[in-house]
């Protein structure tokens, strides 16, 4: 049964999972992010490392897609992708991005802004060969973001490539790479009762962070 669109405006719930107080904050935003990611993982949230990545094309049109966080440091978020993809084309023209982690089971959201730099090939190469072999193969057979005539074409290319590399190492694709997002700001949102949510934003200032509470 399809949802009755007349009822969409009535879909809502109360957020009762907890609060975020100033005393809960850490000196570095990545410390709080690490705690929240840990809690999301152990709350059995599917794909807790999934993050919505927003980029902008040369006309100013924004695009979004979900990618997976693969590592992070005190200053950076790291992900990997096809360097011929639409997102990579955007990043070549405009390195500014925004990320959003949504962990709605525990009523939390983290929004990050920053700019990207490409990862060195040595680091990309090391990560590529930690991926399952089938995932390595799919990198070769998918010309990401390009129009294809059918799914069958893609699957046939996959099976052919897999057969040809059954007992061989998959070569490293030069068109595949990674990015580090240099964090400029990080906002933490905790859903609250009566829509009185808790929001705190960390904004980079020189070599430190300024922290502000935001109105929901």
Curated annotation (Swiss-Prot):
Which one Pfam family would you cite for this protein? PNPOx_N
Q: Give this protein's Gene Ontology molecular function annotations.
A: FMN binding; pyridoxamine phosphate oxidase activity
The note describing how and how many cofactors are bound reads: Binds 1 FMN per subunit.
Q: Does the keyword Flavoprotein apply?
A: yes
Signal peptide positions (record): none
Q: What InterPro entries does the entry give?
A: Pyridox_Oxase, Pyridox_Oxase_CS, Pyridox_Oxase_N, Pyridoxamine_oxidase_dimer_C, Split_barrel_FMN-bd
Where on this chain does FMN bind?
65-70, 80-81, 86-87, 109, 144-145, 189, 199
Tell me its EC number(s), please: 1.4.3.5
Q: Which cofactor does it need?
A: FMN
Pathway as given in its UniProt record: Cofactor metabolism; pyridoxal 5'-phosphate salvage; pyridoxal 5'-phosphate from pyridoxamine 5'-phosphate: step 1/1; Cofactor metabolism; pyridoxal 5'-phosphate salvage; pyridoxal 5'-phosphate from pyridoxine 5'-phosphate: step 1/1
| The keyword Flavoprotein is assigned to this record | yes
What GO terms describe the biological role, i.e. biological process, of this protein? pyridoxine biosynthetic process
Report the transmembrane regions from the record. Answer: none
Provide this UniProt record's keywords sorted from A to Z: Flavoprotein, FMN, Oxidoreductase, Pyridoxine biosynthesis
EC category name: oxidoreductase
Instruction: Outline the subunit composition.
Output: Homodimer.
The family database entries (PANTHER family) matched by this protein are listed as: PYRIDOXINE-5'-PHOSPHATE OXIDASE, PYRIDOXINE-5-PHOSPHATE OXIDASE
Q: What does this protein do?
A: Catalyzes the oxidation of either pyridoxine 5'-phosphate (PNP) or pyridoxamine 5'-phosphate (PMP) into pyridoxal 5'-phosphate (PLP).
Q: Which family is this sequence assigned to?
A: Belongs to the pyridoxamine 5'-phosphate oxidase family.
Q: NCBIfam families in the record, alphabetically?
A: pdxH, PRK05679.1
Q: What is this protein called?
A: Pyridoxine/pyridoxamine 5'-phosphate oxidase
What is the native source organism of this protein?
Answer: Blochmanniella pennsylvanica (strain BPEN)
